């Protein structure tokens, strides 16, 4: 299983850029295999992300902002959920990883 991080490479928001970087750095530091999916380059990727976020997890207004995190095609959560799981030391549960995560080749 591969963690998929949906991000925006050309975001003008400093906050979004920092949040994306924090998620990727955590995955890299913990050798958790992941794939970056840039939603700014392909409309179909953005639409797939929007469609696969459960309705009860969508923001009250507007579109979901990156980063959005999936385990293959299963939605894990957004940055706030990731941050909460990191603070409570439950990231593997958040990412729905049961065993030692696959190591990314360096």
From Swiss-Prot:
Q: Which Pfam families does its entry note? A: SH3BGR (PF04908)
Instruction: Provide this UniProt record's keywords sorted from A to Z.
Output: Nucleus, SH3-binding
Which Gene Ontology terms cover its molecular function? SH3 domain binding
SUPFAM superfamilies according to UniProt: Thioredoxin-like
GO annotations of cellular component type = cytoplasm; nucleus
Its main localization is nucleus
Localization in the cell? Nucleus
Record's keyword annotation contains Ribonucleoprotein: no
Motif SH3-binding extends across 61-67
Q: Which InterPro entries does the UniProt record give?
A: Glut_rich_SH3-bd, SH3BGR, Thioredoxin-like_sf
What PANTHER family has UniProt attached to this entry? SH3 DOMAIN-BINDING GLUTAMIC ACID-RICH-LIKE PROTEIN (PTHR12232), SH3 DOMAIN-BINDING GLUTAMIC ACID-RICH-LIKE PROTEIN 2 (PTHR12232:SF4)
Spell out the family assignment given in the record's similarity comment.
Belongs to the SH3BGR family.
What is the protein named? SH3 domain-binding glutamic acid-rich-like protein 2-B
| Native organism | Xenopus laevis
- Mind giving the lineage of the organism this protein is from? Eukaryota, Metazoa, Chordata, Craniata, Vertebrata
- Which gene name does the record give? sh3bgrl2-b
